[in-house]
């Protein structure tokens, strides 16, 4: 197979909420078709964050290499803009090898930015940020979230009341432009994206079963050594709960436990709750998207159904 001269070579997007079985399904596809997996996960880009991000283990990676994981250390930052640049570069390389990129993950913003590009948001303004930080010191971030709810209810609905970085950025955009950030994101122009995408979404037919999976998943992570993983990362890289890496679901809650802010039982409870909230947001993103081939991630014959559908698309001829 040779795709380099095709104007719009194929790519497969495999999306779904956390604990929906995306990674296992990607392996099934990779064992059946000439694809290469690209991770679309804002936690898996960090080295050493293996357990809490459900990163594929070394045995799987030796069998089926994955792109865009283990890119940076936990004390570094990784943006959606950089993801788009990295992903497009890897996708072109995969296509040049006569294979099809298979993008797998649950970071819906990355999928959106990859297809549509980034909105022309204003750069950070130090004076505005300092003013917002001072207001937050006086009132607290939940109060700042309430202010955002008045100025930009759409964006506020997507942000947790204690997510200081995202609240600050959304308010900053409002103050600098006089417009809600959600409005500016809706107005962004489609960027160049030279691939023909086949979209697959894994959605739960019964959300309570997904919730049970999430509970078991977090318990398994703790049993596998998540607390020690976070402790070692903090010692080696001197990161705290405010760093982007440690704001990832699961890591944030363990940081709070290690800082003696919450008990072990409370850490378990909030870790599961935060993961369920993440799944809820992911499902909201997916239900707003069009052109999806939707499958019940709880279906017993899921792998066979998806493989048959991919085969019928003639992506590899």
Swiss-Prot record:
One of its GO terms (molecular function) is tRNA dimethylallyltransferase activity. ATP binds at residues 16-23. Pfam families: IPPT. Keywords: ATP-binding, Magnesium, Nucleotide-binding, Transferase, tRNA processing. The keyword Secreted does not apply. InterPro entries: Dimethylallyltransferase, IPT, P-loop_NTPase. Residues 41-44, 165-169, 247-252 are annotated as: Interaction with substrate tRNA. It comes from the Bacteria. The record marks 107, 129 as: Interaction with substrate tRNA. Substrate binds at residues 18-23. One of its GO terms (biological process) is tRNA modification. It is an enzyme of class 2 (transferase). It catalyses: adenosine(37) in tRNA + dimethylallyl diphosphate = N(6)-dimethylallyladenosine(37) in tRNA + diphosphate. Its EC number is 2.5.1.75. Its cofactor is Mg(2+). The keyword Nucleotide-binding applies. NCBIfam families: miaA. Belongs to the IPP transferase family. Monomer. Catalyzes the transfer of a dimethylallyl group onto the adenine at position 37 in tRNAs that read codons beginning with uridine, leading to the formation of N6-(dimethylallyl)adenosine (i(6)A). This is tRNA dimethylallyltransferase. It comes from Nitrosomonas europaea (strain ATCC 19718 / CIP 103999 / KCTC 2705 / NBRC 14298). The lineage of its organism: Bacteria, Pseudomonadati, Pseudomonadota, Betaproteobacteria, Nitrosomonadales. The gene is miaA.
């Amino acid at each position: 197979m040779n795709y380099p001269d095709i104007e719009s070579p194929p790519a497969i997007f495999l999306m779904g909420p956390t604990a929906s079985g995306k990674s296992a399904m990607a392996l099934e596809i990779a064992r059946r078709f000439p694809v290469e997996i690209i991770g679309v996960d804002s936690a898996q880009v960090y080295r050493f964050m293996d357990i809490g991000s459900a990163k594929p283990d070394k045995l799987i990676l030796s069998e089926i290499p994955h792109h865009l994981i283990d890119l940076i250390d936990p004390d570094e930052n990784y943006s959606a803009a950089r993801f788009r640049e990295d992903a497009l570069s890897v996708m072109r390389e995969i296509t040049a090898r006569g294979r099809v990129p298979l993008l797998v993950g649950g970071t819906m913003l990355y999928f959106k930015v990859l297809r549509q590009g980034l909105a022309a948001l204003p750069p950070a303004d130090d004076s505005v940020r300092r003013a917002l930080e001072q207001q937050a010191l006086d009132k607290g971030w939940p109060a700042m979230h309430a202010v955002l709810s008045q100025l930009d209810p759409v964006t506020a609905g997507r942000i947790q009341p204690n997510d200081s970085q995202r609240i600050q950025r959304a308010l900053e955009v409002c103050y600098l432009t006089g417009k809600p950030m959600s409005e500016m994101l809706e107005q962004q122009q489609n960027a160049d994206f030279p691939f023909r995408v086949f979209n697959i979404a894994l959605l739960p037919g019964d959300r309570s079963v997904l919730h049970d999976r999430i509970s078991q998943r977090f318990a398994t992570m703790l049993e596998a050594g998540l607390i020690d993983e976070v402790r070692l990362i903090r010692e080696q890289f001197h990161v705290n709960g405010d760093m982007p890496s440690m704001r990832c679901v699961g890591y944030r809650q363990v940081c709070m436990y290690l800082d003696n802010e919450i008990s072990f039982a409370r850490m378990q409870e909030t870790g599961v709750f935060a993961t369920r909230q993440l799944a809820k947001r992911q499902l909201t993103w997916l239900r707003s998207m069009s052109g999806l081939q939707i499958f019940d991630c709880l279906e017993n014959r899921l792998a066979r159904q998806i493989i048959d559908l991919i085969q019928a698309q003639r992506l590899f001829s």
